Every structure is written in C-alpha cells, then in structure tokens.
Amino acid sequence: MVESQIIARGVSDRRVIEAMLKVPRHVFVEEAMAAQAYSDTPLPIGEKQTISQPYMVALMTELLELKGKEKVLEIGTGSGYQAAILAVMADRVYTVERIRPLALRARKALDSLGLLNVNIKMSDGTVGWEDEAPFDAIIVTAGAPDIPQQYIDQLKPGGRLVIPVGTQFEQVLVRVVKQEDGSVERENITGCRFVKLVGKFGWSSDD
C-alpha cells in the first residue's frame, strides 16, 4: 500500500511513510471490510461516515510538517486511523468526534495499539478544543463551507492547518500557515471529496 499508493504519488516525508507502515489500517475498519483495508479508497465505517483513503491521509499529514514534539488537534476522529498516524508522529493528539459510537470504537482501536497519547472528546468539532489550545497543527477530516475562525484562533503562531473547503459534494484541500502577527497564508493544494463538517460553524445536519 505505502509503496504503490503513497510514495509513488509523491509523498516523501520519511516520518509519514514510517507511520503509515507502522499503523495497521485493518484495525480501524469493520471485519467485513478487512480484505479491502489496504486499497487506496475510502471505506464506510458506519453512521454515514468513512475512513479516508490512505493517500489522502498521508498527504494531509505531510502538509502538517510534524517533527515529533507537536500538540495536534484533529477534527473528526471517525475510525481513529488518522489519529493513530498522528499519535505515532507527534507528542500529543487531541481529537474531536460528534458521533458517540464512532468515538467509542476509535478509542478501543487506539487502545488496542497502545496509542495512549490520544485524547478523544465527544463534541461539536467546528468549535475546536479551546481548553487545550493553542495547537502546533490542526487537521480537519471533513469538508467545511469555509474555515472556522476558531481554528485560526486556536493555532499557534507558525502553526499549520489543513482543511477541505468547498461545497458538500467537492472541496479543495487548503493549507493555512499562521504568521507571528496573527495573519494567515493560505494555499490551495488539490481537489478532494470528504463527508461534510457538521456543527455550529459548519454545515447543518439537515443540509
């Protein structure tokens, strides 16, 4: 999976590659989907949610430029797979999931791998996690109509934010770097498709 789907498509950060090799993706999918766990495609995980394709996980993680000592916020725990990759690469991971069954399942999977540096909160991810801010990096695994200001506010100067922004059906992956004066530099990376980011500062669940 890593050689053909990730390295071949341009991901070169050695720490990302090592994390992808270390974390078993099949642990984070339902048993019936285990045979497809290492294909480069999103897979359903229940509750109308998906586990992201491995390439997108690798790309988004690479864009965070993690060195090992960071405090990272993830919005949208989902299966827990992205949080597991972050846990291998960073010091502390804080992840927010609004759907209780997914949060509980992710916690169980992370614990089974001994990844105890991940904190999961069941809440509205669009408001971030103010009590634990600021963060060195923030990654959002659902598509937003725009970038919530809360994420910018909770990012350290020099911090990186990676988030899909667009419509409910297609987005552009955006990388934001917060400057020392509080301003931001924004870069569009590539087109993508994620489930919608639901919450106070995202999409309505009825949209």
Curated annotation (Swiss-Prot):
What GO annotations for molecular function exist for this entry? protein-L-isoaspartate (D-aspartate) O-methyltransferase activity
Q: Which InterPro entries match?
A: PCMT, SAM-dependent_MTases_sf
Catalytic activity, as annotated: [protein]-L-isoaspartate + S-adenosyl-L-methionine = [protein]-L-isoaspartate alpha-methyl ester + S-adenosyl-L-homocysteine
Q: What is its EC number?
A: 2.1.1.77
Q: Which UniProt keywords apply?
A: Cytoplasm, Methyltransferase, S-adenosyl-L-methionine, Transferase
GO terms for CC? cytoplasm
Pfam families to which the protein is assigned, alphabetical:
PCMT (PF01135)
Q: Which GO terms describe its biological process?
A: methylation; protein modification process; protein repair
What top-tier enzyme class does this entry carry? transferase
Could you confirm whether the keyword Cytoplasm appears in this record?
yes
Active-site residues from the entry: S52
Q: Where in the cell is it found?
A: Cytoplasm
Is Transferase among this UniProt entry's keywords? yes
Q: Which PANTHER family does UniProt cross-reference here?
A: PROTEIN-L-ISOASPARTATE O-METHYLTRANSFERASE (PTHR11579), PROTEIN-L-ISOASPARTATE(D-ASPARTATE) O-METHYLTRANSFERASE (PTHR11579:SF0)
Q: Which family does it belong to?
A: Belongs to the methyltransferase superfamily. L-isoaspartyl/D-aspartyl protein methyltransferase family.
Q: What does this protein do?
A: Catalyzes the methyl esterification of L-isoaspartyl residues in peptides and proteins that result from spontaneous decomposition of normal L-aspartyl and L-asparaginyl residues. It plays a role in the repair and/or degradation of damaged proteins.
| Protein name per UniProt | Protein-L-isoaspartate O-methyltransferase
Species name: Geobacter sulfurreducens (strain ATCC 51573 / DSM 12127 / PCA)
Gene that this sequence comes from: pcm
